[in-house]
Swiss-Prot record:
First-listed, main subcellular location of the protein, grouped into a coarse class: mitochondrion
Keyword annotations of the record: Mitochondrion, Plasmid
Species of the source: Claviceps purpurea (Ergot fungus)
Protein name: Uncharacterized 11.4 kDa protein
Compartmental location: Mitochondrion
Record GO cellular component, one term: mitochondrion
């Protein structure tokens, strides 16, 4: 029983500090696609155990921005992620929260 949520697309400046925290009672599949041109795609996939799980990474684009594409397929999960950039513009999205979406 997996709930597939709508995709979210935002544009954020580079460099991008990406922090994802997931606190779930069940296994979670989280896939993130970052791209700034047809020739560049960075994919992050996180499988969480039934414990607190977090990932943090910094991505640098050759251009001045990233297109941020977030696709989620979750069971029962409380998910928070934040985007922080050293540049001006869309610098912070914190938090984006999903809690207890179960079919």
């Amino acid at each position: 029983r997996v709930l597939k949520l709508p995709f979210i697309l935002v544009q954020v400046p580079s460099p991008l500090d990406l922090s994802i925290r997931c606190n779930s009672s069940e296994a979670v599949l989280l896939k993130i696609l970052l791209w700034n041109s047809p020739s560049f795609t960075s994919s992050i996939t996180m499988y969480s155990l039934p414990l607190f799980t977090s990932i943090k990474t910094t991505l640098v684009s050759q251009n001045s921005y990233f297109n941020f594409f977030l696709g989620l397929a979750i069971k029962s999960c409380s998910l928070n992620f934040c985007l922080n950039s050293n540049n001006l513009g869309l610098s912070v999205i914190n938090p984006f929260s999903l809690s207890t979406w179960v079919l």
